[in-house]
Amino acid sequence: MANEFRVCDDCQATNLKTLLPRLKEIDPDAKVEIGCQSYCGPGRKKSFAFVNNRPLSAPDEDELIEKVKKKLKK
């Protein structure tokens, strides 16, 4: 089963220009869905992504990427 990343294109703490290439680097075959994830509260303050339907957030993008890598290794 392919991995899935879901990210918001409207949240203030998420920069799609830098986040999407980094997610694709982790798994080039993953399905990526861009749009509102109804995660607005945390999305104002933290970088986040849904990985295989599970929300992951971190104070910055670097920490988020580390969490994504760790999640996919399980």
UniProtKB/Swiss-Prot annotation:
Pfam families according to UniProt: DUF1450
Q: What is this protein called?
A: UPF0741 protein BLi03984/BL03913
| Species the sequence originates in | Bacillus licheniformis (strain ATCC 14580 / DSM 13 / JCM 2505 / CCUG 7422 / NBRC 12200 / NCIMB 9375 / NCTC 10341 / NRRL NRS-1264 / Gibson 46)
Protein family per UniProt = Belongs to the UPF0741 family.
